[in-house]
């Protein structure tokens, strides 16, 4: 397992974006579908107004537009990959989606390792992205917008894999991601 971000991770996500890219109306994408599902469960979320505001921003940006999206592995973490002969192999694709903003898996890798291996709080994780903002903006255009897209995506994934009442563990994860959304909203950038 490779626990630090390396060139092989970037190459993998670049290939994934290039090989799976497709153009569609935003309203016909998996991302919009998942946002709709998340919206349907807003009343169960911590910080629902913060989530709702982020969703409105994303929808306003993409509404009625043709977008070029690609596959989102959705669980791109060191414990779901291995390297052999200089090649990265990724497994556990059960949460993958086909039409999402490209390269969101980068945020999943960074955030999950920061939470589970470094035990960092939301504000420190956001500060790490901010410190790397110029490089990330070169990749994403506006990394903060892409990070919001990722946070909404992961919230939708976690909320919708549970039926009925959200478990305490999932609620706590959602609260963590909401703190990150709030941090992005309140940042001076």
Model regions and ranges:
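Active-site acidic catalytic loop and adjacent metal/ATP-binding pocket
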Residues: 60-104
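ATP/Mg2+ or Mg2+-diphosphate-binding catalytic cores
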Residues: 127, 157-189
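Active-site activation/catalytic loop segments of kinase-like enzymes and analogous catalytic loops
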Residues: 103-138, 151-166
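Short, polar/flexible loop-turn hinges at active-site or ligand-entry regions and domain interfaces
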Residues: 1-3, 97, 117-119
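Conserved kinase catalytic-core helix
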Residues: 1-32, 51-66, 70-79
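Amphipathic alpha-helical protein-interaction segments enriched in hydrophobic
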Residues: 143-153
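A glycine-centered beta->alpha junction motif in the catalytic cores
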Residues: 1-4, 22, 35-44, 152-168
